[in-house]
A protein has these predicted regions:
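N-terminal presequence-like segments and the immediate start of the first folded domain
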Residues: 1-58, 62-75, 81-128
Length: 128
């Protein structure tokens, strides 16, 4: 089946991959892992996981808006963090952006992400 690609200037890909894809005629949107990059490609919040989490959620929001939805459409997120002790700050940032029901969520602690300044990455599945 063919699929469509969702792109947004708020969350530009920096390599040869897709920000989000959806099967033609379907409602499920698969969003690639978002990191704390702004629209200009600058890392936001070096050393500050809460600032990075806020930027990541803004990037997710931008992808969802480009697909015709918003954060309320997220059904599942997977969060990758590099330090377990950062989880409370990430959870606090998550609580600031979600109104009402939270999506299903998985937390995974990893040794590192693809750039040493990134402290977290979040991917998602939404129904839009």
């Amino acid at each position: 089946m063919p699929f469509s690609t969702i792109a947004t200037p708020e969350a530009k890909p920096v390599a040869n991959y897709k920000i989000a894809t959806r099967m033609e005629g379907g409602r499920l949107l698969y969003i690639s892992g978002q990191v704390a990059w702004d629209a200009a490609g600058n890392i936001v919040g070096k050393g500050d996981v809460r600032a990075q989490a806020r930027q990541v959620f803004e990037n997710l929001r931008g992808v969802l808006r480009a697909a015709g939805g918003d954060l309320a459409n997220l059904m599942k997120i997977t969060t990758y963090i590099t330090r377990l002790e950062d989880f409370p700050a990430v959870a606090q940032a998550r609580g600031e952006v979600f109104q009402g029901e939270l999506p299903a969520s998985t937390l995974i602690v990893v040794k590192s992400l693809f750039h040493p300044d990134f402290l977290l990455e979040i991917e998602g599945v939404a129904s839009v």
